[in-house]
Amino acid sequence: MGRENQATIKDVAKRAGVSVASAGRALGNYGKISDETKQKVLAAAEELHYIPNKLAQSMRSHSTKTIAVVVADIQNNFFGAIVAAIEQKARQKGYAVLICNSNEKRELELECLEMLASKQVDGILLASTFTDRKEIPTKYVKTVFEKFPIVTFDRKINGFPFTSVLTDNYAMAYTVTKYLIGLGHDGIATIGSEKEKAVSNTVREREEGYRAALREAGISHDGMCITVDWQKAAETKKRIDILLDYHRITAVIVLNNSIVGEFLKVLDERKMSFPEQISVVTWDDEEHNIYMKMTSVRQPCRKMGELAATSLIEQIESDSPQQEELTITLNQTLVKRESCRINKTY
């Protein structure tokens, strides 16, 4: 049915026997109106299959009741779980959600932000490819980053008074590495996402936590901390093969869930089993990790999404903009299963 055939608020008012102003108050849930009149209007609206004109409402209220989410990699189940939690929480609060994927590319992120700004969203939730204000072109600082309420999640942008909902990647990588050292491993490698390391601090923080634990134990890590682009299968296989061929590796920490599949393929081709020949810890406790009894780092995806959405909506509905940065740090959990064992050479 075209818009011209849809019932208008005048039609609803006529059917209910009230003024247009009263119908507007009843449908918009504002102002003073008796329960009896409100019920008449709502009944009339239902009978006529009335659909509110959101554009007109937003022009009157100066709010679109829409928030945007710019995510770094929608193919990553970690981000997918966060977005699902954001969407659910936003819907509970009466907000619609627009989703944009930057695919870990800064130029695409800026395009997404410019497009979303043109749609006059009320606020933006952002897992950014930028780590500092200085990296962002001035045009976008002025038209987006200083204009809209913004909350970042998983990743922080230094130099802005934003709320950031994060996890302590350094501390968890340190904990994972200490766990493997405690099992007698002294040939511990990491494999991280090349694309993510280029544009965010996540992989770097995990690598730093890993190195700190090894330094503390007096264990070398030369050449055992690599990154790969999982979308380039042949190159990824080559790098992992080199890692396993030229180093005495007894354990591997896979720093990004997007890499796990390619890593396991290489182990399968080399007829290497875990934990018998190599111990493995992965990031993000997904369903296949549980099925394969893989020791994993469980991330608080739902809580991160809910807190990010709640924080943004509170800012949108606040009378004054946020003046100081706020960091909310959530706990990750090491879930120990059967992919690690005591190193027999210990």
Model regions and ranges:
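Short beta-strand segments enriched in small/hydrophobic residues
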Residues: R15, V20-S22, M59-Q75, L125, ...
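N-terminal helix-turn-helix DNA-binding module of bacterial transcription factors
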Residues: M1-T64, R341
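Helix C-cap/helix->beta junction micro-motif
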Residues: L48, K93, V144-F148, A217, ...
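Hinge/beta->alpha junction and helix N-cap segments in small-molecule ligand-binding domains
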Residues: A72-A81, I99-L108, F130, V165-T175, ...
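Flexible loop/turn connectors
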Residues: K237-Y346
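Short acidic capping loops at alpha-helix termini that bridge into adjacent secondary structure
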Residues: D186-G187, H221-M224, S273-V280
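Alpha-helical recognition/docking segments in bacterial nutrient-uptake
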Residues: M1-T8, H62-K178, G182, I242-R248
